[in-house]
Amino acid sequence: MSSIAYEQLYHLDVASLKAAADRWNDVARRYRQWGEGFGDGVVKPFDQAGWTSIDGTAVLARAQVAAAEKEFGDADTEAKGLRAVLEDAYEELRRYKADLHQLAADAPRNGVRISGTGEVSLIDPDEDGDQRRGPGGVIPSQNEETILRWQTRIALILTAAANADQSAAIALKHNTGKGGDEGFNDRTVKSVDQDESQRAALLLKKYERGDKLSPAELAELDRLMDHNQKDPEFSRMLLEDLGPEGTLRLAEDLEHERAGDGRDKDKYNSVQHALANTVATANRDKEFSDEWREDMRELGVRRTGDDGSRPYGYQTLTTLLKHGDTAGYPPRFTMGLTDDIIAAEKKHPDLWNEYDQANAGADVDPVPVMDPVDDMLGIMSRDPDTATAYLDPGDDGGNERLKYLLDQRDWPDLEVREVYRGQEPTGTVDHIDASNTRVGLGSVLEAATTGEEPGPPHTAGQARIMRDTVGLLDTPPGHEEIQPNLRRPLANCLADYTDDTHEILSGVQGSYTHEAPQEHGRGGDGLFGRENDAHMSPGSDKLIRLMRGVSEDPEAYGTMHKAETAYIAKQMEDTGGTTADSVREPVRKGGAALGAYDAVREDVVYDKRDDANAQEDWKAKTVYHVAGTPVTMVPGIGDAAQRILDAWTYDVSNEEKGYNNDAAAAEVADRSLQSQREMQFLVDEWANGPGMPGMDDPDVNDLQLDMRNDHTTGEKLANDAIGR
């Protein structure tokens, strides 16, 4: 591909392109006028003369007159095509020139100088920012990173401009036709997009037929797709040319390239990425999307080939879509397509299952399944606002998507038919959870309940989803089971709502324990607050049982515990007081909340009582994650709270580092994570801070006693909830 230098684009005379396009408009008008004159002055008189001849001379003459008349029309068509291409080139290059000028204007305000030839330097470089980082200095310095960032922005604009220039040049060449005896071109394209979509479609169809693309053809295809993947007109025309079935066959072939190790794998992966974006871009148009999805409703439940092992259309489509820039997909498309797939699986149960057979008593390992619904949920998780809109039950509870996914859906699995001696079926069929089951669901739940930024405030929609998730996943005491792939995402969700879970577990905040009016529906029903500052308040028993199920994963438990500790430290700091009485409420609430964590942790350990290694492994991993988890879900932590939290984290990690086996680390967990010891440590750190009364103050000692009483209350509350 040809390149454009910085100074060429910066000083490009785009007005000349506009003037050229306007002149071609004049040319087209003149050809039309000449054609009309030829028709009036030659064609009509010739036809009116009624000339006939035996030797065919009249027929030949009439054909020549008609050919001449057609040339005037073709000349008009060619001129219009050239004008259209020049107008497209003008619009694109004008935009890229403006982008470059804006970048140059922004640079000085950011301490960056861009020379007339595009060289980037810092106006006043920070001497401390010159040090390269990482082992052996392999990571660029901060100053180098700044320069690289601006160089990259310039390069992206220049590359896009060069693409536009090359695209226009090729389209102009196509529009002029072959010339010579063939005359003017009557098959011109009406835009650069049309020309490029036709060329891309030809190359893609050639590849899909199994014909090998030459290096030049593959490079051109990669350029065409990369340059146009976010262009609505190109995308619609390309998909219309390929057709829905052709698109699916192509998507399957490209996925095979990804799984292989061919020499051109990276280029085909780039084409696959662009094709995914092209599908999403085309579906921004409502009329196109409605028709395209209608076709997919039929193709989605059919296999993409005659082979019974080939995937279904929806499986192929969602696999393709995962490889695009999913965060930018249009919400109407992602939500609508997900609903289409759910409607299909309700009509065709077990459509996405995998099947196998095994001898009686043989162990069968879980395998991944191609679950298009879960794929789409994972895609939506990249756009938190869309995730929330999709799952929000609404003020009236009318949206039941969350209920379907958490409570009603028969998730695809591995169906294993038992056989005797490898042949005779025994009649026994086992269902084994897929290794990747609910991965997308976990991601979309986390996005939908937490939003873009960690921690509160939460919107009413986010809080509704969190509240209903707690309720829908509730189980009877003693049966707190959460599917493994949901545990960490749910722990992240709960950690994000620590301001709510803390109050619920402490059981003393009236807004969480009594009906409270609210402005966005169903007042007091597990939800209160304002539209953009809402709180979930499910029953403490349901919350505790969910925490217990999630805590089977030690990392999940560590995430929640660390968030709770950070929140307690923040609450102590937020009082602004310097006496024991000033922090009494946060300390007592903290004791109660951590008492509940004690009960949860002890129940997990108790359930592993028959396997000492499993107990030790869980404890060791828990203390590791509690000590190592960064606190991002509790915003607004000040210096005093951070000091308290850092001291406790250092104490835990210091003890943990002193042991080199799981058994010893488990002892650290028993000691360090026991909530009475933890709260005592936090209170002592607070009391020993600047201007504080000191840990030996009698009032501080009384506060520690109150905390222990509340710890017992919180622990009992949790034990009752989980049936201990």
Named regions from a protein language model:
Residues 1-177, 212, 723-724:
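N-terminal secretion-targeting helices of virulence/extracellular proteins
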Residues 181-721:
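Non-catalytic all-alpha helical scaffold/repeat segments
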